[in-house]
């Protein structure tokens, strides 16, 4: 997969190219990341990249000419088929379904805004899609772009050490992940659930599914509204709710 970055601070992306899963993907040739700074396309000696907004108001906007030239350079390097994405609070909110959708593209160009944003005409003429990572404001689009790159790269074949890792991630099937445990078996009198030590893979699978369903019901119930539960899932969720109610009743009795 090839990803082009338009950013005033391309050095920030060393966090992606040099470390962790994405760093290994770059090293192994599974992910290629290039960057262009609008500052390199500025024509004045001060390398100006911001300009005042028409109509007044606080803050500045990214200057049109250097930004467009940087986008055009990235498009030329990418060749045909590159999708241009602007990271913006006004965009579609990124979720696992969106990540899976974006991962089908072989080439992405990510435009990272700064200041108060970019000229609307640049969005209309140069941008294919706008994406947001949440309903809050950041200083620029670099962190959202890194979030998108990290999540999308997990779908590239060979990037993860275990083939099932991406499919078992939280949200991969619309549910939150189940609890996980490692050594020691007992930590401050808290024991690993016995089923995980049983070696019974069928029961372990059922336990994990039940915990995943239950955790989603407790923490993100709206996610369940969009799912058509199987008969097994519905039964396991009912069991979890019953067990949870019993635990709550027991806890209330001890309080």
From Swiss-Prot:
Q: Per the UniProt entry, what are the Gene Ontology biological process annotations, in alphabetical order?
A: tRNA N1-guanine methylation
Q: Mind naming one GO cellular-component term on file for this protein? A: cytosol
**What lineage is on file?**
Bacteria, Pseudomonadati, Pseudomonadota, Gammaproteobacteria, Enterobacterales
Residues holding S-adenosyl-L-methionine: 113, 133-138
* Main location per the UniProt record: cytoplasm
Compartments (UniProt record): Cytoplasm
Q: What keywords does the record list, in alphabetical order?
A: Cytoplasm, Methyltransferase, S-adenosyl-L-methionine, Transferase, tRNA processing
Q: Name one GO molecular function term.
A: tRNA (guanine(37)-N1)-methyltransferase activity
The name this protein carries in UniProt is tRNA (guanine-N(1)-)-methyltransferase
Catalytic activity reads: guanosine(37) in tRNA + S-adenosyl-L-methionine = N(1)-methylguanosine(37) in tRNA + S-adenosyl-L-homocysteine + H(+)
Q: Per the record, a Pfam family?
A: tRNA_m1G_MT
The EC number of this protein is: 2.1.1.228
Family membership? Belongs to the RNA methyltransferase TrmD family.
Give a short account of what the protein does: Specifically methylates guanosine-37 in various tRNAs.
């Amino acid at each position: 997969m090839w990803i082009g970055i338009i950013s005033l601070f391309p050095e920030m992306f060393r966090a992606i190219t040099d470390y962790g899963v994405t760093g290994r993907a770059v090293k192994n040739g599974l992910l290629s990341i290039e960057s262009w700074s609008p500052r390199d396309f500025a024509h004045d000696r001060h390398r100006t990249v911001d300009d005042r907004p028409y109509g007044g108001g606080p803050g500045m906007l990214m200057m049109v000419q250097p930004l467009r030239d940087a986008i055009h350079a990235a498009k030329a390097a990418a060749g045909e088929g590159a999708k241009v994405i602007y990271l913006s609070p006004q965009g579609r909110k990124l979720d696992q379904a969106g990540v899976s959708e974006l991962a089908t593209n072989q080439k992405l160009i990510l435009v990272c805004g700064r200041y108060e944003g970019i000229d609307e005409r640049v969005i209309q003429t140069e941008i294919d899609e706008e994406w947001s990572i949440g309903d809050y404001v950041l200083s620029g689009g670099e962190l959202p772009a890194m979030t998108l790159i990290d999540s999308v790269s997990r779908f590239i074949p060979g990037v993860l050490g275990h083939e099932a890792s991406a499919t078992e991630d939280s949200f991969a099937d619309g549910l939150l992940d189940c609890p996980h445990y490692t050594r020691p078996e007992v930590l401050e009198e808290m024991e690993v659930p016995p089923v995980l030590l049983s070696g019974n893979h069928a029961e372990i699978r059922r336990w994990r599914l039940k915990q995943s369903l239950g955790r989603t019901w407790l923490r993100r119930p709206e996610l369940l509204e969009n799912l058509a539960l199987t008969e097994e899932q519905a039964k396991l969720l009912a069991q979890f709710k019953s067990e949870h109610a019993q635990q709550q009743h027991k806890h209330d009795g001890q309080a």
